[in-house]
Amino acid sequence: MGTFNPFTLEGKTILVTGASSGIGRGIAIACSKMGASVIVNGRNEQRLSETMSEMEGDDNLSLAADLSDNVALAEMVAKLPKLDGIVHCAGIGQRVLCKQLQESDLENMMNVNFKAPVMLQTEILKQKKINKSASIVFIASIACDSPTIGNAMYSASKGAIISYANCLALELAPRQIRVNCILPAMIWTELIFKGGITEEELKEDEKKYPLKRYGKPEDIANLSIYLLSDAAAWMTGSNIKITGGGS
């Protein structure tokens, strides 16, 4: 008797952006363990190599490119095979009070967190690099509707990508291509240390969560596996919060 596994990714080719660290790295590694052929993208070739060294399988591929550069983006897409799954995970964070916002800060945040994934997805569709019945996952954030001081730019960028993804889900539904968003709360990655908060303060804050901890990249990876697998064949246009019980 065969083993029933509705979450297998065997036979699927999946692109993961932002795979050089954090959540993206965790997702890439997990997808490879579930049998997928994984293409990892990030700006730092050395860190992508570190991700590749932790992945399983011998048919994975690393494509370093700055997705905020339209030329580099188009060249990378041209190298892609047909995809069965895409995880848009590349992103940055920066805490700045509203009265101290600089236009350059806003442009950088929106370019990386919103424009780059939108234009990447556009180019993938234009070059017909995605298969029917594929799955697209955007890593957003509960910050979109959970305001905190100094987080206006980041919150707005994640709210924008969720709105885009919800529209994309409707447009691609006739081709059975599914589009969903994951909205994590605090996850232990390098990103959370860039807000000027100490590790001690973060460890004290995580005690406020009902499950008494922040999330780990693996927690987000496991949900991503579900959305990428055929087990989620009837799920599209959803925005899934994963928060350890926090609001």
Question: Model regions: which residues?
Answer:
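Conserved glycine-rich cofactor-binding loop
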Residues: 20-22
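Alpha-helical segment proximal to the catalytic Tyr-Lys
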Residues: 126, 170-174, 233
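C-terminal substrate-recognition "lid" of short-chain dehydrogenase/reductases
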Residues: 213-242
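Residue(s) in the substrate-gating loop at a strand-loop-helix junction
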Residues: 141
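Substrate-binding pocket helix/loop in short-chain dehydrogenase/reductase
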Residues: 97-98, 105-110, 201, 205
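Active-site helix of classical SDR
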Residues: 121, 157, 165
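Short C-terminal tail/terminal secondary-structure segment
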Residues: 2-5, 146, 225, 236-247
